[in-house]
């Protein structure tokens, strides 16, 4: 297990329990700092003996940025000073055994790092620690520090670490949190090779089943190589050290032209041709790094050794998000996959997931599971992590989660609950305990072994971790905290309240007229409660907040969701339904909650398959509805979802039976090229 990340002789609670292992493995000398920072006149930033240009550049960086945060310019000096100051010595040492080191001797603090990324992070750790003791330095905008300023040394757990979330993509804070800047790290990313090929993409289409197919690319094509080569030379250059992903399109088929087949391609295995291109590019550009993705047509491991500047990104899409216990079959299968890749490369990056991509707004308690997975990845040879989140779209608790995840990427042994508490204590002075208690309860709810779904609706979330009673209590209490909070805390709480109004609406819709629902039942009719309209009004405030335009990966707009609520659920004040409360049955059997939804008198929303629809995945179903005692005349309405982009379609035919005899057959016709939303049939 990777446990020796960093250590100190005077450990804060974040490092408790690590000291024995850390001391044994690193051998750093321990010395505590006895004076507080405010006891001296200021800070002298300098360099050691035989300085390099990098030493000087980083010393000037710290001088300039510490000076900006000081309430007196003269309390921060560079090079020499006659004042009684703390002396901070900056050194870059590529031969350093650890990634970073802090050495304390009297009033001298020496910061040494092996590379620029760790030096930047280390300097902001210093600034934050100084600001906590010295009121003359402002570090209020910085996240909590995760190390103590005593003699300390350590190494980042992973060579590459990035988080694709609003906070993780903020260029002002990626380096502060020790993250790689995602936008600057990759010359080509993911399945974006077509953007590089541009207008010439038609020249490199794949051959599938003997025909040219524009859904996939040919990786043995000389034109493909030349286009990528020109792109790198013209846009990136040959002297830098960028990373590039060379991957097929997101389809399961591979090119089987004569050239690709000669390299070893088969119908669903593109690894041979992709590997040859990877080897060729890595030789052509030895200072850059080239990766492909272990996913779909490139999931099969190559039999060729990859050079030091080539590697693999392994998708964890088939490794469910649940507590790791060493017993799960999918866990063992993923371990075997990593072990196979370890035989051909040391550069193994993991593409993992930290959001529910069908719902960015409902809290997603990923932190403790992510910690376990990071330990697992490290033990099994991973050298880099890409956490795929909500991108630039708002996600509830994102700033806190990004802080905790960035700390765990540096050291997976840090205690999650302490990190969460430190963040809330700093950012939410009024509501810190209330937020902490609720969020940690969510985290603990999934430690029983339940799976976190990354494409889940509200019903699945409730089954996994989202207790309706606790959530509703939390949501209802939020208004008082928003009213009582001040400044930035009030704005952030208001933002969270607005986002969670989506969750409250979804929970209300899912529960219909039960105690957690949006409506009340009176006999054979239901009526929306006044509170439901308040939730919708609160959600309409999303325009006030950056990034809160969409609620999922498919870029479904919050405004459209609101419009559908108003059009389909709240349009009529009272809804009468003679089938209300009658429980259907099905052959073959299907989800009982789904069947109950058929007669709950709550309209499904056509824009989202999670919103009120019953999924029937088999070719043929028989739905039985007991109607004994109903002697009134009227129309029966059946609504079907038609959402081709998500592969949801209405049936081709409906047979209506009464007392065992078919008395009506309805044939349905839909245009798959048109997004119809729903198809209503009156019987």
Descriptions of predicted regions:
Residues 223-224, 332-433, 437:
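Structured mid-domain segments that build the active-site/substrate or prosthetic-cofactor binding neighborhood
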Residues 646-661:
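Short, surface-exposed beta-strand/strand-loop-strand elements in extracellular ectodomains
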Residues 36-46, 58-61, 65, 70, ...:
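Feature activates predominantly on carbohydrate-active enzymes
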Residues 662-682:
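Extracellular carbohydrate recognition and processing domains
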Residues 564-633, 639-650, 669-676:
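Disordered, acidic Ser/Thr/Pro-rich linker "stalks" and the adjacent N-terminal cap
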Residues 295-318, 361-368, 394-401:
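Substrate-binding cleft/loops of secretory-pathway carbohydrate-active enzymes
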Residues 139-143, 416-569:
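C-terminal non-catalytic alpha-helical accessory regions
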